[in-house]
Structures are given as C-alpha cells and as structure tokens.
Amino acid sequence: MRHGKKFNHLSRQKGHRAAMLANMACSLIEHKRINTTVAKAKALKQFVEPLITKSKDDTTHNRRICFAYLRSKYAVTDLFRDVAAKVGDRPGGYTRIIKLGNRLGDNADMAMIELVDFNELYNGGKKEEVKTKSRRGGKAKKAEPTTEAPANTTEETTDSAE
C-alpha cells in the first residue's frame, strides 16, 4: 500500500537520504548548478526551496535552522549572503530542473538543477527599466544644441610637374 508516502525515499534509509540531500544542496548553493538524476533533482528541489525562503530573512534563528539541514557553515554563509540577495524579490520557484536525456551507463534519466536567478542565458534579456519623470504643467528642459566640430579639412598641396 502507498499510505503515507509523501516524498520519494530514493531507495535509501532516512539518515543516508538526509546526508545525500544536504550534500547536494551544499553543492547546488556553491556551484549554482549541478547534474543529477531526475528523481534526485525533484527531491532536492523540495529540500532546498524552503531553505532559500528562510534565507531571505537573515536572523540568527533562520541561520541555525538552515545549518541544521545543510551542516556546512560555508554553504549557510553563501546562502544568506549571495543567494538571498539575488532572490529577494522572487516569491518562490528558486530552482529550475532541465532534463538532459539518459545516462550512458545505466540509462537513468538525467537532469540539471540550477538556481533560477544565476543563469545568465535565461536572464540575459532582462534590462533595467528606465523611468521617465513626467512633470505637470511645465515643459521638460530641452537639451542644449550640440555644436558639431568642423570637419577636418586637409590642405592639398599640389606640386605641378615642371
């Protein structure tokens, strides 16, 4: 029966699964992108997204909670300093899973899981919006007319043939 099976056990005992997810989460936070199987990527997504949400509020309590899951002070520091600064305005969905095909050795479905805001290819098209200020009742200042420099004229000296 399938009662009470809320998440994928990944064919591992609880301690092994928790250690594996903690190591994968530390690698994801450090490298911003890792390759793994689809099942592990989905389990990692459920594991790491609440931690990223907690990192948006930098308190000692949240740091201790994240450290209890990650078990690496370097990953916690990186999470609260770099990752939280980038995802501060995003309401959720901090990771993206991209399927890569099958592994040659055992034909396992492979995927790449990455932090969304750290991919320059997908986010490269976004530009800062330039706000124009509108004034009520008055005209905007006109730009001063620019005077163009006179064109460089070269004097040609012609020596007549004698």
UniProtKB/Swiss-Prot annotation:
GO terms for biological process: translation. Residues 146-155 have a biased composition (Low complexity). GO terms for cellular component: cytosolic large ribosomal subunit. GO terms for molecular function: structural constituent of ribosome. InterPro entries: Ribosomal_bL17, Ribosomal_bL17_CS, Ribosomal_bL17_sf. It comes from the Bacteria. The keyword Ribonucleoprotein applies. Keywords: Ribonucleoprotein, Ribosomal protein. Disulfide bonds: none annotated. Residues 126-162 are annotated as: Disordered. SUPFAM superfamilies: Prokaryotic ribosomal protein L17. Part of the 50S ribosomal subunit. Contacts protein L32. PANTHER family: LARGE RIBOSOMAL SUBUNIT PROTEIN BL17M, RIBOSOMAL PROTEIN L17. Belongs to the bacterial ribosomal protein bL17 family. This is Large ribosomal subunit protein bL17. It comes from Flavobacterium psychrophilum (strain ATCC 49511 / DSM 21280 / CIP 103535 / JIP02/86). The lineage of its organism: Bacteria, Pseudomonadati, Bacteroidota, Flavobacteriia, Flavobacteriales. The gene is rplQ.
